[in-house]
């Protein structure tokens, strides 16, 4: 049995005060994925911008001030190293202006993107939370709203830094995440390392 340090923390939504002058400034970067998809004649296609996603989760506006930037809108199976570099550059270009970042992303290559960004943006002392969903945000049974809310809570918590995946109530270190289930909402596992938060 591995003797890892206990890193699990519990973050409560009620810890945030929407009237606080210390409300965090968060930048949301959109890259596409199932979370942003709508049904088209060609099937599910990433169509929604970050701004449109946030309209489904109005409570996020009480957590922080949010700016949005759509970098691209892709099925994540089409993400390449060039896209990782583009995301890393967007983080660098905006790093000084924001307290944290939330990246919406498809699940198929989310773990690869998280690992790549962990090395492309080394030493980050601000939270860079990557999230997505198994079902589009406009579905009745979607996991999108919970995952987005959790990602913003983590980005605002002041207890996390660096690149992490936030998914299905778990926070997983970006270099340790792996997609292990394609159908369950609990799609990601942390390999040989404890979850950072629940």
Language-model features: where?
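Short, Lys/Arg-enriched N-terminal segments with co-localized hydrophobic residues
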Residues: 6-22
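Active-site histidine-anchored catalytic micro-motif
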Residues: 23-198
């Amino acid at each position: 049995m591995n003797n890892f340090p206990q890193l699990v923390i519990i973050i409560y939504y009620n810890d945030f005060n929407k009237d606080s002058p210390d409300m965090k400034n968060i930048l949301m970067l959109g890259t596409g994925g199932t979370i942003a998809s709508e049904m088209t004649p060609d099937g599910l296609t990433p169509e929604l911008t970050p701004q449109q996603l946030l309209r489904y989760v109005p409570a996020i506006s009480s957590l922080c001030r949010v700016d949005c930037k759509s970098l691209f809108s892709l099925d994540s199976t089409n993400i390449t190293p060039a896209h990782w570099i583009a995301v890393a550059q967007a983080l660098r270009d905006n790093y000084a202006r924001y307290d944290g970042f939330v990246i919406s992303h498809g699940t198929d290559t989310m773990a690869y993107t998280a690992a790549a960004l962990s090395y492309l943006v080394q030493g980050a002392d601000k939270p860079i939370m990557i999230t997505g969903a198994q079902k589009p945000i406009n579905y009745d049974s979607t996991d999108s709203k919970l995952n987005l809310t959790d990602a913003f809570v983590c980005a605002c918590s002041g207890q996390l830094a660096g690149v992490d995946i936030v998914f299905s109530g778990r926070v997983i270190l970006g270099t340790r995440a792996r997609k292990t289930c394609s159908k369950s909402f609990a799609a990601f596992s942390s390999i040989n390392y404890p979850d950072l938060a629940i």
